[in-house]
Amino acid sequence: MNYQKLRILSYDSQFNLNEEYEKRFNSYSTIHTGISIFPFLNEQKVTSEKYELFYVPLPSMIEKAEKIKYNSEKLRKLSTSAKLPGIAQTKIFLSTMIDEIQSTNETEGIESTKYEIAEAIVNRETKNKSSKKRFEGIVNMYLNLNEMKFEYIKTKEDLKSIYVSLFDGESDIDEWPDGEFFRAGQVELKSNEKVVHRGVTSESEVNSAVTDLINFMNRKDLPFIEKCITAHYYLEYIHPFYDGNGRLGRFIMSSYLVRKLDPYSGLSISNAVNTNRAKYYKAFTEVSHPRNKGEMTHFILDLMDLIISGQEISLLQLEEAEGKIKHVLNYLDSLDDLTPAAINILFTLIQDNLFSMFTNMDDSDITAEKDISRYKLNPILKDLEEKGYIEKIKLKPSTHVITKKVIDEVAI
């Protein structure tokens, strides 16, 4: 028999809802979170009821957690494999990150383009402080994850600091928090003109709930995946800010999974959520339904499915990248009119073509990547150009790309 939601079982007239709830809640294996919610129904909080969030660690949950860890190990090995050269690794990561930011924006109805996000990456890499780009804050925070610069949440100030770093100066944040740390007023979420959630009411209640959340996040006695997912739900339940809560919550979840698993497991969350938006939002409303009485079991299972889905997409992309590199190496081995140094530079430009989303490496990028002087690079570029392997597309900064002849050879 499937482990059903309490809400679904309650529609059976022979079923005793309270008895089953007590059995689940008081089971020896049940995990109690110590954080509580008021349920939500018919556009209103049910303040006459309050439930502690809990979950039952079913065999299927343990199996999914193991699957996530197994996939993570595969991702870690693939993404750092010698079969994927450094340029390919960097470009694939940036492409994944751009998809992640684009997806988290789309989920919240924020209009953005991948080109805008790529511009913010370039601005950060060139340290251009005179021209601030849209999404610069969120791009910087996601890039920090790849550099192993993590945000730890020990206090309310830490949570507020992450929010400011993500969204400071962004035009799509309509209303900034007006309390000491968080919002002072009330907030509600609507879908098709219907209220689907009301955040924790007053500033003092928000502060108290955030303190409970932080205490929960820093518990050492819980499995980290289940804890991460539960914390994600509770942050969205609190809704401590007027705008940006969804993107904030998904960033924090990404950050935690990057730290505990690997970059690709963490940076595929929003893409999977955006693809399965209905499932994601339905999971939230189920936890909040009065008849489910605060049970998180199915929410955790649903979000584990999304994590696995994102991982599988990343695994496929990395495996395809390995196949492309193998094909390129076979092509390079067939060339008999180039020096090893020229083949090395051509390999660099082919990787740039295969894995860059928008911007090309310029010649100075090549010197930095290959640790070669311009004095030595220029004659190699000239030789490649004369033999029809590359062409110059820009004077300032000097930029070369592979020709159509090479593109046709390496395409698979």
Predicted features and spans:
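FIC/Doc superfamily catalytic core
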Residues: 1-412
